[in-house]
Amino acid sequence: RDNLAWLEFRRVLFRSLIDTLKQTEDPVFLCTIGTTETSLIPGLSGAGASEDLTEYTPAADVELMILNNVHCMDNVPQTVVGESVAPTPALLSKAALELANIPFVIINAGSKIRPDVEYVSFGKEYGRDIRSGKGVLNPLEIFENGKDLGAELSRRHEMLIIGESIPAGTTTALGVLKALGYEANEKVSGSMPHNPHDLKRKIVDEGLKNANIDPENDDVDAMQAIGAVGDPTIPAMAGLIIGSDIPIILGGGTQMAAVCAVIKSIQPNFDFSRINIATTVFVAKDKTADLFGILKQIDNSITIHIVDPRFEDTEHEGLKNYLTGFVKEGAGAGGCMFTALVRGSSVEKLRKKIERVCK
């Protein structure tokens, strides 16, 4: 009977969130960008045409969303697949936000390359290579700035949708999850069909060792974990969530699990019913990962929604690469597409809009 009561309570919360998302006149999307020099490690990230270009991807993503072109580099960020390219997920987000007529705010949590658009800065430091054990130099500053903005936005809006753009983010997420004691090896997703789990684990273990962190025996707090093997977007998003008091859609996969783990570390009794994760079917069905297995370790009340844009029906060759395991998610794509669908768009209308934006 207690279980049935809890399930009914969850259904009420779900309906409440969906109703809020349908009816609210002023939801806002927050795209949090950052850099980790971990992305320069060969073979780790596909979020760019080369390792060097991964540092430009976050800035280019938001320039593309706002300006319709890129100023910080010569070409649009992309994943090269044979003779075609997989469009950046920022274009999926852009299409969905335009369809749903939702404004957005850019948050620079710590990007080495600064975008040529207006943004809110959470600090001047970008993320370092986590193998050093000093991945983020100013995690508390970023977190506190996130809390302040989260509180301010809660006074202006009824709902927040939060996404991130940071190449190698699944590796830094693995680092934070492991540092906080979660079993995440072989469970984080990635931007390529071949998920380099061994490389990710080796990178994280080297960082933990150099930070003198032993998760099995040490009582590691959230800022310590982020400072050692995290990236700037994680404390930024955790701060935004903790600082706010309104419903939130987290658009993403593995990185959002790490954010939830950080929140749980800071506030063990945090009410996760206020948070819903929305991600793509490409993450949810990733056979090389286990997002659900990670989330279950953190809190059973975290709700996750899966969005399928039906790219098997597209004639856009680049978008078809999502079906074979490239890219999968990023820049809040899952959350933005979920929002567009809840607010009245059909899947076909959404896909057609994405195709036009990606031309």
Model-derived features with residue positions:
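N-terminal loops that bind phosphate or other acidic moieties
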Residues: 11-161, 167-359
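Single conserved hydrophobic/aromatic residue that forms the stacking wall/gate
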Residues: 1-12
